């Protein structure tokens, strides 16, 4: 099994790069995000590799970081997500952004991936929500609040305040973070209107 390749960029295809390693050209399939960050032909590059062996072919997938490769593997544990969809997701969201989106139950962010509809996005978030916090870089309290809202366990004023901010055009992660901060400031029993005011102040900082 090939775990890493280091060589010179030979050429690019629509969804792959040819990496020249000691005179042998390896065709490595990558996300659009990875391809955009690789250097020009003739320059050196290093890719972490995931090797797929089938009866009729051997296929290599390349990643700039081990974390990106790990997300490629995790995504494919979700029903209906294969290598092509996993690469598309990683082409739309950087690994850290994907982790944050899943941890915060932000299905809309995942659904921005071409070819990923609301149902697949929901499965990705639902099936990976317990794994994402380990990779996310958001306040655990915000993750907890977003999960409570998604599971309909959050107090009604909190859920309504987040919904109001989303309706004003803020993203789900921004709204959840702002209302989490507002809830800490206001204390228990705060009404929706107060949370919205405090949340908007937080977003204006």
Curated annotation (Swiss-Prot):
Region (Flexible linker): 144-154
Residue ranges of the region described as Domain III: 154-205
Subcellular location: Cytoplasm
GO BP: DNA recombination; DNA repair; SOS response
Source species, domain of life: Bacteria
InterPro entries: DNA_helicase_Holl-junc_RuvA_I, Hlx-hairpin-Hlx_DNA-bd_motif, NA-bd_OB-fold, RuvA, RuvA_2-like, RuvA_C, RuvA_C_sf
Spans annotated as Domain I: 1-64
One Pfam family this sequence matches: RuvA_C
Assigned keywords, A-Z: Cytoplasm, DNA damage, DNA recombination, DNA repair, DNA-binding
Main subcellular location: cytoplasm
Chain residue ranges for the region called Domain II: 65-143
GO molecular function terms noted in the UniProt entry: ATP binding; four-way junction DNA binding; four-way junction helicase activity
GO CC annotation terms, alphabetical: cytoplasm; Holliday junction helicase complex; Holliday junction resolvase complex
Record HAMAP family: DNA_HJ_migration_RuvA (MF_00031)
Annotated function: The RuvA-RuvB-RuvC complex processes Holliday junction (HJ) DNA during genetic recombination and DNA repair, while the RuvA-RuvB complex plays an important role in the rescue of blocked DNA replication forks via replication fork reversal (RFR). RuvA specifically binds to HJ cruciform DNA, conferring on it an open structure. The RuvB hexamer acts as an ATP-dependent pump, pulling dsDNA into and through the RuvAB complex. HJ branch migration allows RuvC to scan DNA until it finds its consensus sequence, where it cleaves and resolves the cruciform DNA.
UniProt subunit comment: Homotetramer. Forms an RuvA(8)-RuvB(12)-Holliday junction (HJ) complex. HJ DNA is sandwiched between 2 RuvA tetramers; dsDNA enters through RuvA and exits via RuvB. An RuvB hexamer assembles on each DNA strand where it exits the tetramer. Each RuvB hexamer is contacted by two RuvA subunits (via domain III) on 2 adjacent RuvB subunits; this complex drives branch migration. In the full resolvosome a probable DNA-RuvA(4)-RuvB(12)-RuvC(2) complex forms which resolves the HJ.
Domain notes: Has three domains with a flexible linker between the domains II and III and assumes an 'L' shape. Domain III is highly mobile and contacts RuvB.
Family, similarity comment: Belongs to the RuvA family.
UniProt-recorded name of the protein: Holliday junction branch migration complex subunit RuvA
Gene source species: Bradyrhizobium diazoefficiens (strain JCM 10833 / BCRC 13528 / IAM 13628 / NBRC 14792 / USDA 110)
Gene: ruvA
